[in-house]
């Protein structure tokens, strides 16, 4: 019989982070310990996506209020701005900023799909197959891309965790923006809002704002801080962390596109320079604060969705999001622990759930 030291064996190619499957004892006991128990990742994806939709409606209402409160451009002139003085005004550049966002949206979806393929490869599911094999196309879209130099994160469930981090950061930033744009009304810069149109149907305008992400609705005065800059920077951070794991070129490409988008926003005079700078700082700080965690969003954010009676289960199945692990013991150590267990049974009339779980996972080797 071969003897091994006490250790954990994982499936080939999988290296789980420490405490990937928290023990039962960690979340038993006090109320706050139970509140810190992570929700299933699938539940977080669904509920935080619903939260994002709700926040989008809140922002749409805030944009409506801001439009009505905006100072009259005929009376209040634009504020002095160093960016306006250094950059020549190019009215059509705002369209290019939208194009930059559209390009990054597509690239982020592609990256998220590649992260999903990495997850499948990690758990041993292999590459998916198309109904009809198209030479070159199938290999490009369905092959696993991995830049090992930038891969320092556990790949299991990485696509789900990345989406949770992205959507929660975006929701927090939009919710804070809803408050900021209403609190202080700044004079419109030298853009199309110098002659703001009247909103005839507020409800329709709110719905259009949500459905078109602001592109098909009327809103002026939402200056501090820039929503376009938020999404540009959020894509930048997403690819700086996760895109670089797929391909090394994503970092420089997205950085150039984001910087060009910032330039377009200021050069078109749709935002003051401070609107852009504050949005960049807040987005980077929020994305870092939310962080990447095997449990998904920080437990403080999960408190806002923990009480929901719908949209997913509130208890985590061990096999859903966790790393399957087999624990091996030396035979003499297992005999000794079984003796301790029998002694506790005679003395206390039973054992705890955690002890039972541990010995069920034990194996002779």
Swiss-Prot record:
GO molecular function, one term: sphingomyelin synthase activity
Residues exposed to the Cytoplasmic side: 1-44, 114-165, 251, 297-365
Major site of localization recorded for this protein: Golgi
Organism: Trypanosoma brucei brucei
Active site: 228, 271, 275
Uppermost EC category: transferase
Protein name: Phosphatidylcholine:ceramide cholinephosphotransferase 4
Gene name for this UniProt entry: SLS4
Matches recorded under Pfam families: PAP2_C (PF14360)
Family of this protein: Belongs to the sphingomyelin synthase family.
Keywords: Golgi apparatus, Kinase, Lipid metabolism, Membrane, Sphingolipid metabolism, Transferase, Transmembrane, Transmembrane helix
Signal peptide: none
């Amino acid at each position: 019989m071969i003897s091994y030291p006490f250790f954990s064996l994982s499936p080939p190619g999988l290296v789980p982070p420490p405490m990937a499957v928290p023990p039962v004892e960690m979340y038993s006991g006090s109320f706050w310990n139970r509140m810190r128990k992570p929700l299933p990742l699938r539940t977080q994806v669904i509920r935080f996506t619903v939260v994002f939709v709700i926040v989008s409606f809140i922002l749409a209402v805030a944009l409506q209020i801001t439009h009505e409160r905006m100072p009259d451009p005929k009376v209040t002139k634009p504020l002095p701005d160093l960016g306006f003085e250094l950059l020549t005004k190019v009215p059509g550049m705002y369209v290019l900023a939208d194009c930059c966002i559209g390009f990054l949206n597509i690239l982020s979806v592609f990256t998220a799909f590649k992260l999903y393929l990495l997850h499948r490869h990690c758990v041993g599911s292999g590459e998916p197959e198309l109904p009809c094999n198209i030479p070159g196309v199938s290999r490009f879209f369905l092959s696993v891309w991995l830049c090992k130099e930038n891969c320092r994160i556990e790949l299991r469930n990485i696509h789900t965790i990345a989406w949770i981090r992205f959507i929660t950061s975006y929701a927090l930033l939009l919710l804070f923006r809803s408050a900021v744009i209403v609190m202080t009304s700044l004079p419109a810069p030298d853009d199309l809002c110098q002659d703001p149109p009247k909103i005839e149907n507020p409800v329709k305008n709110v719905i259009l704002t949500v459905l078109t992400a602001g592109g098909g609705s009327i809103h002026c005065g939402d200056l501090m801080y820039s929503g376009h800059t938020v999404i540009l920077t959020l894509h930048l951070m997403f690819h700086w962390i996760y895109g670089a794991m797929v391909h090394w070129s994503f970092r420089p490409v997205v950085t150039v596109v984001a910087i060009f988008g910032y330039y377009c926003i200021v050069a078109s005079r749709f935002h003051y320079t401070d609107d852009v700078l504050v949005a960049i700082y807040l987005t980077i700080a929020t994305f870092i604060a939310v962080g990447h965690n095997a449990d998904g969003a920080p437990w403080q954010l999960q408190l806002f969705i923990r009480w929901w009676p719908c949209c997913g289960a509130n208890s985590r199945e061990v096999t859903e999001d966790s790393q399957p692990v087999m624990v091996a013991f030396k035979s003499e150590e297992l005999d000794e622990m079984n003796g301790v267990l029998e002694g506790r049974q005679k003395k206390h009339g039973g054992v705890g759930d955690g002890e039972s779980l541990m010995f069920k996972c034990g194996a002779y080797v």
